[in-house]
A protein has these predicted regions:
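Structural marker of alpha-solenoid helical repeat scaffolds
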Residues: 32, 66, 100-101, 134-136
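Residue-level recognition of tetratricopeptide repeat
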Residues: 36, 70, 104, 139-140
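TPR alpha-solenoid repeat register
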Residues: 39, 73, 107, 142-143
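Position-specific recognition of the canonical hydrophobic site in helix A of tetratricopeptide repeat
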Residues: 41, 48, 75, 82, ...
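Canonical tetratricopeptide repeat
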Residues: 42, 76, 110, 145-146
Length: 155
């Protein structure tokens, strides 16, 4: 009796049962992503903090595929763009985040920085930075620093 004759019924049963099999190079296919948009964003933050910007960007994109109005993921994606010197793209991310969440003060602050880095007129950057500063909170020192940078550029 050949090995093929013994193995064939098992292979057919596995194939018909829907159980995935491995052949050649192994590939993992995820049929259902168990992570939420927020969890993909958090994973992106972890990748970003370890310097793995490409993986972070992929996670932020996945978060946005799951929830296109996830302002936090959009701001984080803008930060990746900014880190790579793509200020125009970063600006678009921050503007979209503000459309989705008009009180996202990090987005306001980061948009002010993006406008400043692109040499844009400072009126909008100043207004954004002032609004972020007025929000108070634990990130107020960061927002004040941005406002000071905008004011310094205007002199």
């Amino acid at each position: 009796m050949s090995v093929l004759r013994l193995v064939r019924p098992v292979l057919m049963a596995v194939a018909l049962s829907g159980v995935p099999t491995l052949t050649g190079c192994a590939h993992l296919v995820v049929l259902h992503d168990p992570l939420t948009a927020s969890e993909h964003n958090d994973l992106g933050v972890a990748y970003e903090s370890s310097g793995q910007l490409d993986l972070a960007a992929k996670e932020y994109h996945q978060a946005l595929r799951l929830d296109s109005h996830q302002a936090r993921a959009r701001v984080n994606l803008g930060n990746i763009e900014a880190a790579n010197g793509r200020w125009g793209s970063a600006e678009k991310c921050y503007r979209r985040a503000l459309r989705d969440s008009s009180t996202d003060y990090d987005a306001m602050n980061d948009l002010a920085v993006a406008l400043l880095k692109q040499g844009r007129p400072l009126d909008e950057a100043r207004a954004l930075a002032e609004r972020a500063v007025a929000s108070g909170g634990e990130r107020e020192p960061v927002y004040r620093s941005t406002l000071a940078e905008v004011d310094s550029a205007g002199r």
